[in-house]
């Protein structure tokens, strides 16, 4: 199985070029559902130890249903499929450019939640025009064990987020473990309180905000991903959810740039335009770098060929 590894603002992506499972025909959403239902061992083998680690996002290239798209892609992590992934889309654009499959300019990628457009600006810089994002609920308060009441917004940016404006813990590298523990507790509190996304969807990402360390940035964040890892990047879908909240509050004008900093200090430049459904169409600009071109080997005698799951 050939893969290309990259990182976007510190967050890793592994693009699977060949050797993936046969997902049959149908829409990309149908094929993504088939991947999650029937091929979890494949996903685990690609992103988990001993070949990977819990922060890697997999990106399986598949034929697009829409012939106008340069690629079809299904994103997955160490737990499940992802409807959309901003950092991995930037990484995919840079990977395809590295392979000579796309050139600078506008391109379309088909994802399970819709078509996204990218602008390949140079060999390492990509702007992603994401799907329409929106806020579902404002100022939702839940009682968090050992912490007390925590208030945040519920918003969609390609995945479901609970966004907390003022983190009770400083967003520093030294606090990664307590920040992870806190966000896991918040997610559990949401589940116990029955707080969900649209149609009962699981809110699988928790996003905390605080003051930026970079004087050019407006905010710093910490993002808990579904499998319990933290996002090294500012999180593209999380930025999209944040833009939806800023727009709904009248705190950011259409087309106005906003610099979002991650917990490791990397940044995305983000902005939005009004969406046709009342939400926002986010644009996320960041940089990615290819780190390896590898062949994954699966030995039938290897007891951990499908990954280590604890």
From Swiss-Prot:
SUPFAM superfamilies the UniProt entry points to: Diaminopimelate epimerase-like
Keywords noted in UniProt: Isomerase
Q: Which organism is it from?
A: Roseibium aggregatum (strain ATCC 25650 / DSM 13394 / JCM 20685 / NBRC 16684 / NCIMB 2208 / IAM 12614 / B1) (Stappia aggregata)
| UniProt-recorded Gene Ontology molecular function terms | 4-hydroxyproline epimerase activity
Under the heading PANTHER family, the entry gives: TRANS-3-HYDROXY-L-PROLINE DEHYDRATASE (PTHR33442:SF1)
Q: Which family does it belong to?
A: Belongs to the proline racemase family.
Query: Which EC numbers does the record give?
Result: 5.1.1.8
This protein's record includes keyword Ligase: no
Q: What is the superkingdom listed in this entry's lineage?
A: Bacteria
Q: Name one Pfam family in it.
A: Pro_racemase
Reactions it catalyzes: trans-4-hydroxy-L-proline = cis-4-hydroxy-D-proline
State the conditions that upregulate or repress this gene. Is up-regulated when the bacterium is grown on t4LHyp or t3LHyp as sole carbon source.
* Function summary: Catalyzes the epimerization of trans-4-hydroxy-L-proline (t4LHyp) to cis-4-hydroxy-D-proline (c4DHyp). May be involved in a degradation pathway of t4LHyp, which would allow L.aggregata to grow on t4LHyp as a sole carbon source. Displays no proline racemase activity.
Q: Where in the sequence is the active site?
A: 85 (proton acceptor), 235 (proton donor)
Listed InterPro entries: Pro_racemase_fam
* Gene3D superfamilies membership: Diaminopimelate Epimerase, Chain A, domain 1 (3.10.310.10)
Name of this protein? 4-hydroxyproline 2-epimerase
Quick one: which residues bind substrate? 86-87, 205, 231, 236-237
